[in-house]
Amino acid sequence: MSKRQGGPMGGGPHGGMGAGEKAKDFKGTIRKLMKYLSEYKIGLIFVLLFAIGSTIFNIAGPKILGKATTEIFTGLVGKVSGSSGIDFEKIAHILIFLMCLYVTSAIFSFIQGYIMTGVSQKLTYRLRKEISEKINRMPMNYFDTRTHGEVLSRVTNDIDTLSQSLNQSATQIITSFTTIIGVLIMMLSISPLMTLVALLILPISLGLISTIVKRSQRHFKNQQEYLGHVNGQVEEVYGGHNIVKAFNKEADVIKEFDETNEILYQSAWKSQFFSGMMMPIMQFVGNLGYVAVAILGGYLAIKKTIEVGDIQSFIQYVRNFTQPITQVAQVANMLQSTAAASERVFEFLEEEEEDQFAQNPVSVEGLEGNVEFDHVHFGYNADKIIINDFSAKVKQGQKIAIVGPTGAGKTTMIKLLMRFYDVNSCAILIDGHNLKDFNRGELRQMFGMVLQDTWLFHGSIKENIRYGKLDATDEEVIEAAKAAHVHRFVQTLPNGYDMELNEEASNVSQGQKQLLTIARAILADPKILILDEATSSVDTRTEVRIQKAMDNLMRGRTSFIIAHRLSTIRDADLILVMKDGDIIEQGNHEELLKQNGFYAELYNSQFEKTSA
């Protein structure tokens, strides 16, 4: 399970993202994030104003509280000396004013938090929407070389990490720097000498922060990356758990998962360890400054240079001064997490897209469905060509069968026909027009597909059949189901056509899934049909019934059929026999048997197996 074999149509290169991903571009990622945030600048301006206002009111508190302390101390001294007592009325006024400041600060803090949450959620919504739209524009090669879980991790884990860390870090950046500046001003107004002593802790703090951030940066990156790998493995194994059990591969799967999970554990442990180190180290450094200021303040009070209330205010300011420094360390940590998640999201959004529109698009209206392969060369990698100089002309209404052993290039031909991949050289033509001259969406509307891997979504049977033609009436849906010989089966189900299929459509059999996908293709009424192992998952009796229905459907339409059971394509107008990417034989069934070549060998070997 360690390597994925292409996409749902098979073929394609192996792949997956590894640990060799490019190094983090922290500054570039933050610039991109700021560009996104600039669209919410009005909200961010209000966040800035309310955060600054809340912080300023909070900063003023210790200074005012110091006045109350001074008033109490003066009153006590006066009472001892017999001159006067404590002025409780004045103290009450000071405390009421102080309470009003703190209440206002709390209200401002609530408002800025409310606005910032809205901004971060709007950004999250936008990024999820862009990723969802981006997925539909991505080339098939991207999904053939990555696990589903890795892509899903960008939409879920990375976006959630970005939203949460942004919501916290943006506000803390504002409040931390405002607090540092405001507290510094208040400290200088009380005592420049005490301020100088308090500032001596800064070089130590900054040095420790810088060291820890540098060490934690790469671990946060690895944590996000391998979280995607773990999700991909879980999704892959869960989707194929029956196969895993059938081949007794539980131990191998667990071993592979443990290896990836171990890397994730180590990265997460180290990143969280360094993150957790910041707070106790910064608190220790802050306490050193606190002790130094307390000693100096007592000395200055004895010298009557400052008042007792100023000492209390200054000590509280020292505590408030070290707290935002600690918060800056936490913000630096969160910014690393934000940048790591943002980079993965932006990397996905900046992936190369398919060209959806041609410069001078050809209209699909009135096209008949003649197809020509003109000396086609193709390889998933430029240095490994798997289709060499393939040429064939298919007239409208013909039934074309493509046969050959596994890996011969049969499914690849279909991918090229639908422009999931572009040819390396020469061209594929429809009614004389190069496929590249069509808009991709309009081109694919010409095709109806019944794939080997049936795909049905969570919804009613009626909705699944109607997927090929959303404006189809209920009567048209039923007629398509009858043509696919699935109508009688649907009638036996609870709620009939309104029965809900579960997430993996496991409440119907594989053969019934195949019939429903055939009904969907019939309803779409395409000009060109692609049948990839269309009847390989049903019993012989059902296969015969489906074959008759498909013969009626294919009459008058260009049809491409990929099948390993050669008995199903004996009436094909043209059979292309592929081996190692080349067409080595072509003709109808009788002609190919007379040639007594590779096709005859394949056909006779299947006949012998059937007889045995």
Predicted regions and their residues:
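Juxtamembrane loop-to-helix connectors within ABC transporter transmembrane domains
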Residues: 20, 29, 37, 116, ...
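Alpha-helical segments in transporter systems
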Residues: 34, 42-67, 98, 113-117, ...
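Transmembrane helices of ABC transporter permease
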Residues: 39, 43-56, 101, 168-222, ...
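An intracellular "coupling" helix at the cytosolic face of ABC transporter transmembrane type-1 domains
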Residues: 39, 140-141, 159-166, 170, ...
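Transmembrane helix-loop-helix hairpins at lipid-water interfaces of multipass membrane proteins
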Residues: 44-108, 189-193, 304-308
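Helix-loop-helix
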Residues: 186-200, 270-343, 348-349
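ABC-type nucleotide-binding domain
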Residues: 357-358, 364-612
